[in-house]
């Protein structure tokens, strides 16, 4: 089964994945007079927090919440802001997705990771659909961000692993 088929929301109502704190923080940073793409938008919960920008939901599965159906491993765009929240952790091809996002954003980018950092990037669990939960060696992610200006924040949140890491990139 293709990973893109694992989360098919169709006409399901919008709902958040875990604590909405990081949706709010990410959109507060991204919101500006430009397009904000939410890569792996799911049910587009982040959209409700956009006040200034034009929200575009990008996902691998069609739903009423998705504006663009795309495989993030090959997708590139030209967006003022990009949000990737709780996506890289489920993708063994996370490097390709991160590279594409870094090539595509023009103003701001936020990466939100919900798994704890570890000594090595590896799977620490999986969903019932056998999609991995990757824990990252922090340096593996930061190596991609070093050419940019970025700040980071870690929060204890009501999510599966009790933590979320936000990387704010300009």
Predicted segments, located by residue:
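S-adenosyl-L-methionine-dependent methyltransferase catalytic module, highlighting the catalytic core
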Residues: 92-170
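Short catalytic micro-motifs in class I SAM-dependent methyltransferases
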Residues: 86-90
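Conserved N-terminal segment of class I S-adenosyl-L-methionine
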Residues: 1-78, 134, 161-166
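A conserved beta-strand element that flanks and buttresses the S-adenosyl-L-methionine
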Residues: 83
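Activation segment
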Residues: 76, 91-92
